[in-house]
Amino acid sequence: MKTKYIRIICLWLVFAVCVSCQQETNPPGLSRQVLTYQDLMSADPGDTAIIANRHFMPSEDAGGALHTFSGKLVIPAVPMMTTPAKIAPANINGKATQTLPALGIEFFSVDGYLVPVVRDLLNHSDPDNFWQLQADPGRVWSEPDDNGMSRASFPFILTGDVEGDAWNAIATFLYDDQGVSALRYQVVQHSAPYFITTPFTAAGFVDIAYDTMPTADRTGLVRAFRQELADRTPIRPWSDLASQVGMEKLSDFDAGTKPEAVITSGLVIDDVIYTRPFATAAGDFPYPYGMRFGVWSMSKSMLGMVAMLRLAQKYGAEVFAYRIGDYLEVTAPHDGWNEVTFGDALNMATGIGSGSDQLSPNNITDGYIYGDQQEYDRWYLAPSVREKLDYLFQNPNHDWGPGEHVRYRDRDIFALSAAMDSLIKRREGPDADIWRMMVEEVYTPLGIHRISTKFTTEGNGQPGVLFLGWSLYVTVDDISKISRLLQSGGSYKGRQLLHAGKLAEALYQTGIRGLPTGRSNTHGPGSYHMSLWHSPFTTDEGSQVSIPGFQGWGGMTVNLIPNGMTAYRLKNGGDEGPGMLEVANRIRPVEAKK
């Protein structure tokens, strides 16, 4: 969780006006007027206007694809044509921000879908380019005026190679067995960045090539993708929920927030996702299962806490009491790390940091980032695990020691990540790692088939260490599945994936409570425990309960409500409000545990 990201709202208002002016309708039986065959084949380099996202989808007179897609799109590096014209800063850590990277993206088509073979952040060979890209499944189809060619579109994200944000985009092209048209893309939304200071959109044509080839293990990939479709949590529009409970109960769901900063929000009720629109500068995003979010510090909970709970289930709850110094080479010039445990690091209570000694009241963000920003940025940009550890161990310690007071520090969570990596390698061998454990033993059993993250960069081709402080890229479906696991005591389909006792502690279902944050809402003071932000809430009966949640930079919020619902709001700036909790309570009253 980083401090509030202040967006340049006026730019987005301009974009929205431009889009509304350019939207065109395609009545049934009429040919499309936007992104036509001629547009895609001629690829006018001056055509860089954002257009409505719906034009990247099948028209009303579309039919099935006329060709099977099997091969690689070869995309060259090209300047991004952005609004505003220049991205600031122009380079970050020596890497250019204005250029799309050169990539080869392999796809296959099946059942009307265009499916990437590699469903992860793609690496490129240019050390001077800032961006990584990840593609998600799209669609293939045909339209009458495309001269016998087929059409395809797909969603993707861009993210900085050291960042935790996601810039949401969509692309389309024509293809047949001989070749492809130009690729038309546009970048239309984003989560809050850290280094990038320009909220931008981008659009343009790219001349691409189609390298046709058989898809290796196509049978297995098709089987896996069809299972992925079967495992999707149903997504329903907000209007469906309104028709069930009445719009008056939902009216202030996003109250207290800046509407222009909300990308989407919603409720997960009885394994159905009821979502508000996926807002962008070009209208609603047309791929709800393919809109991937960089959720920043929500990763501490959805990845970090869940990984610790999985280790506790495998090795015992005592892993929370393991000392960091027994698993890492600590180079600090003080003894502050001597008694710091894995649990202390997850609780943000290491007693390490450059903040003040002011404790009455304590402020959880005292000393966070801006207290020593130059030092923070050096640590942030350090590529390898050893360099990151050496930087973080230079931080001073407080007099009070571990376990006493909470101070929010990404660096402590990274120390935990490195220690967890050391632990699993000692137990399971040098090839074991936390990310593989999470994918194989938690995410895949939940039906999360594709999820991505970032690692440190090590020399000699060695695998990197997982970031836990930020780096997870998820969809609302992923959020619903992880939340359901936590709401279900860590059990899924009769299999206990997470340690039930420690999970109950994290959710305040035992007598153990976390440390005060110095923050409060209208119901009382908040606290922090095991990466969860706990917000007090007064029930209709007058009892006070605690609502645990994940939070991320820019206002990313997920609340695990004790009535079994999950509320989420994904944003890129602005203030928080209590509306989600109030609405959930109206639909299904929250009750205090007896």
Which positions does each model-derived feature cover?
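Active-site SXXK
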Residues: G294-V319, A345, L416-M420, I479-I482, ...
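Bacterial N-terminal signal peptides
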Residues: I9-C18
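Active-site-adjacent helix/loop patches that line small-molecule binding or acyl-intermediate pockets
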Residues: D240-S265, P333-I448, V474-S480, R484-S488
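Active-site-proximal binding-pocket segments
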Residues: R436-R513
